[in-house]
């Protein structure tokens, strides 16, 4: 009974074994060549997708740089436009040959209002603390401390106004502060 369970290749002739192995090898070679072709195609597709994504990223970066460049170049344009009427008023004032002190004062006041309005439209806000207001080191710069008949560490006087732009200090207000008694 042991001979009936024997391996069929053991009973086959060497030529038959070689033919079977060659057929098996040919099938395996065909399968591997097909798999290799599929993997090469997938690799080429992924390489193409990578190159396209890389090119798109480069285009996005370049467009962003262009936008930033334009924003820097033209961002101040509206601010400059809002100051042009102030320049016009100053030119007109200088063109007057025989102005009285009252006229000069009125013109200066009107020009200052124009300038203040232009600054406010561009989110530049004046820091001008009132006397007696609590000293705030974030908004004020103390130039000196003076004896005063008011609470200590409060503003006595403003020597120079300060300015904020969009909640950022451009210049703190220069103030004198009441010293402790």
UniProtKB/Swiss-Prot annotation:
Entries under SUPFAM superfamilies matching the protein: Coiled-coil domain of nucleotide exchange factor GrpE, Head domain of nucleotide exchange factor GrpE
GO cellular component term, pick one: cytosol
UniProt record, GO biological process: protein folding
Domain of life of the native organism: Bacteria
Family statement drawn from the similarity comment of this UniProt entry: Belongs to the GrpE family.
Function: Participates actively in the response to hyperosmotic and heat shock by preventing the aggregation of stress-denatured proteins, in association with DnaK and GrpE. It is the nucleotide exchange factor for DnaK and may function as a thermosensor. Unfolded proteins bind initially to DnaJ; upon interaction with the DnaJ-bound protein, DnaK hydrolyzes its bound ATP, resulting in the formation of a stable complex. GrpE releases ADP from DnaK; ATP binding to DnaK triggers the release of the substrate protein, thus completing the reaction cycle.
Name of the protein described by the UniProt record: Protein GrpE
UniProt organism field: Delftia acidovorans (strain DSM 14801 / SPH-1)
Gene: grpE
